């Protein structure tokens, strides 16, 4: 209040104090975030000017939100260490943590996710969503991030039309 702005920090599905029985990796969460944004706008009205920011899965969610139609009160997006899509992130973790290839587990898990939650791992794509975003976006990523590999931010940055900025933080991990 002292600085003249408000901060809304909602928990995504099945995280923090939020309800839900499964983390949705940002894909269904993007719709929840848009509802929160609209609620904030209803509360603050004409004075609303919004920056949408997220870290890690929240960053992927932020980018997934960015590809949806945006009301005039949204001014820009800030993503910090978000992944390209769920398929890429899960494939990387399957290999890194368990030494397993994509086939057959990724294909089975993708199919089960489609059946249970109505979306697939490749559909849940920050990469496709940022390509549709025409508002400014600031990308932040550590050059030592091995959880969400730094290479992912370069793909995301390349896919996003101008205006955009990229900051690779030297020595920073996830």
Which residue stretches match the model-derived regions?
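Alpha/beta-hydrolase active-site loop
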Residues: 23-44
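Alpha/beta-hydrolase fold nucleophile elbow
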Residues: 44-56
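Hydrolase active-site cap/lid region
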Residues: 64-120, 128
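Catalytic histidine neighborhood in serine/cysteine hydrolases
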Residues: 157-174
């Amino acid at each position: 209040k002292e600085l003249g702005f408000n901060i809304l920090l909602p928990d995504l599905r099945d995280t923090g104090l939020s309800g839900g029985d499964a983390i949705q990796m940002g894909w269904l969460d993007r719709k929840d975030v848009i509802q929160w944004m609209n609620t904030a706008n209803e509360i603050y009205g004409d004075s609303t000017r919004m920056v949408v920011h997220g870290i890690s899965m929240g960053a992927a969610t932020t980018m997934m939100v960015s590809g949806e139609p945006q009301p005039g009160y949204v001014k820009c997006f800030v993503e910090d260490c978000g992944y390209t899509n769920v398929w890429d992130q899960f494939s990387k973790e399957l290999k890194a943590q368990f030494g397993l290839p994509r086939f057959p587990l990724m294909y089975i898990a993708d199919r089960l996710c489609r059946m249970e939650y109505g979306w697939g791992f490749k559909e849940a794509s920050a990469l496709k969503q940022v390509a549709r975003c025409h508002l400014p976006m600031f990308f932040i990523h550590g050059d030592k991030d091995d959880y969400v590999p730094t290479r992912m931010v370069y793909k995301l940055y390349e896919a996003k039309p101008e205006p955009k900025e990229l900051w690779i933080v030297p020595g920073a991990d996830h």
